[in-house]
Design a protein with these regions (language model features):
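Eukaryote-biased recognition of intrinsically disordered, low-complexity regulatory segments
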Residues: 1-8
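Compact, glycine-rich, soluble single-domain proteins
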Residues: 12-47, 51
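Glycine-centered recognition micro-motifs in short, flexible terminal segments and loops
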Residues: 66-67
C-alpha cells in the first residue's frame, strides 16, 4: 500500500498503481482532466505508464462545460 496526497487529501492506494488506475478508481478515466504529479504536468500519453509512489502529491482538475 502507498500513501499519496490527492487534491490535498491523504489517500491510501494499492502498490504499483498508475495514474490511469487512479483515474479509473474515481471514474475520471473518460473525462477531460489535467494531472499534476509532484509539481509536474503529466501528458495524457503517460497516464498508463506513470506509477505512483509513497508520498506523491497529485492534483487532478476536470473540466465541466457550461454556458
Amino acid at each position: 500500500m502507498s500513501k499519496i496526497q490527492l487534491n490535498g487529501k491523504k489517500v491510501v492506494i494499492k502498490s504499483n498503481y498508475s495514474l490511469l488506475d487512479l483515474l479509473k478508481k474515481y471514474k475520471l478515466a473518460n473525462k477531460k482532466v489535467a494531472i499534476e504529479l509532484n509539481g509536474t504536468i503529466i501528458q495524457k500519453t503517460g497516464y498508463k505508464k506513470k506509477k505512483l509512489n509513497n508520498n506523491d502529491k497529485i492534483e487532478i482538475v476536470h473540466f465541466i462545460g457550461g454556458g
